[in-house]
């Protein structure tokens, strides 16, 4: 199984709070993969540039990416994005742009999106998601 961690889950994992996130990671099967979208990676880098200790933040991100692969766009992401951006707009229930990209990236890989932001992602009925903070 592919598990795509969104930004809030990655930050929880890096801070080891709540501890249940690390516990869930330790319970994964050998063939399971932890990945993050390039958008999550960009958000982490943005945070590092805004932090008081840039070098320490970048090093923490580098260590993280040794375990959690960064995945980059493919055509399928765009197809899912076009579908869901219009579907949600017609329903009058759009979600944030980055969240929509996360969801579409996970859909393109048939991955489970791991998030604490379930309210937004519940709107995308094709998406598999889990909240590992519970």
Curated annotation (Swiss-Prot):
The keyword Magnesium applies. Its cofactor is Mg(2+). SUPFAM superfamilies: PIN domain-like. The keyword Hydrolase applies. Disulfide bonds: none annotated. Its EC number is 3.1.-.-. Pfam families: PIN. This is Ribonuclease VapC1. It comes from Haemophilus influenzae (strain ATCC 51907 / DSM 11121 / KW20 / Rd).
